[in-house]
Structure formats: structure tokens, C-alpha cells
Amino acid sequence: MKGDLIVLVPDRNTEAAVAGILERHPSLHTRPVAARIIVHPEKDPGCRLHGHELLRLYQNDFRFALLIFDREGCGAEESTRTELERLAEETIASSGWKGRCGVVITDPELEIWVWSDSPRVDQAVGWLGRRPGLREWMQRQGFELTSAGKPLRPKEALEAALRVARKPRSSALYRELALKVGFERCLDPAFIKLKEL
């Protein structure tokens, strides 16, 4: 075996976030994980439709396979996150990974993980010390927030905040957030599932 974990993701931002999360193995209460992260060339739809085919190539090289993609943009938005996860897990398991695979689908998309109440989010986004505060600004801009204080349109809210702060949206931002924001602050069901895998 070449490693512990092969992870298939839809884009570079998810790749950077997952790499940062895996570096924080003490916070995950696990040993260091020998992982390889690959990006599907067909993004979210490719992960959903063909992820099992790509992962099949690695079944003799890694102990566990993980597939991550966004519900929004995957081509099956009418399905729930849990329905999509179940179907994808069944498909991957039947392709040779039975008992050694997991699927995490961000809902609606990866940026939902960005929005915790940590001041590190404001710092990474370039909003530290600004008035009004980031969440108040989002509401003033018309971004509806959930009861947990997360925007219903997390990607659009992040992009708008970065534009105002004149900070580029980059993979480095996702990695920085993954490395600095406390895991206990993220109560998103998909993130909790990722921590438990």
C-alpha cells in the first residue's frame, strides 16, 4: 500500500481545504494520515458520475477512499445531501472499495464550511476590525443568514466580502481557514461526517 487515504475532490479550493484539515490530525484525534488528494477534471458532476471509476484505479494502493463534492453544481440538486452520499457510497463500494470508502457532500457547497463564528474567518477574509462586522455587513447586503449565522448563499457571500476587502479568492485562503479555524466551531453536518470518517 502506498498510503492510508486517496481523496477525490472537484477543484483546487477543496483540495487545499482538505489538505489543511488533514494536516491538523491532532484536532481530528488521529495519527498523521498518508494521503493523496486528486482533483477530478470534470469538477462536481464528474465526481458524482464518474468518481468511482477514478477511485477504482487506486484500490490496491490506499486503505481508504474518500469522495468530496458540492451538492450544488453536481447535476442532481433535486436530491438531498444524504441521498447523494448514500448513492455514491454504494457505487464506490461496489467498485472494489466495500467497507473502505466514504462520501462527503457539502451542501450547498464547500464555502458553507468557511462560515463559523471564529474571528479567524474575519481575519482570513480581510475583515478584521472593519465596521460593520462581517455578518452585519452580509445582512445589509441582502444575504439571508441561517439560525446558525451562515449565509444561505455561502459562496456568493464569501466572494462579495472578498471583493469589498480587496482580497483575492484563492486556494491559499481555503487552506488558511482549514489550518486556523477551530473544528469544534463548524457544526455543518457534512463537516461533522468528515471528522468522523
Predicted segments — roles?
Residues M1-D4, E15-I38, G51-L66, D70-L197:
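C-terminal accessory helical subdomains adjacent to catalytic cores in phosphodiester-
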Residues I38-R48:
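Eukaryotic endosomal/vacuolar membrane-trafficking regulators centered on PX-domain-mediated PI3P pathways
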Residues P10-D11:
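Helix N-cap/beta->alpha junction signal
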Residues V7:
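Conserved SAM-binding loop
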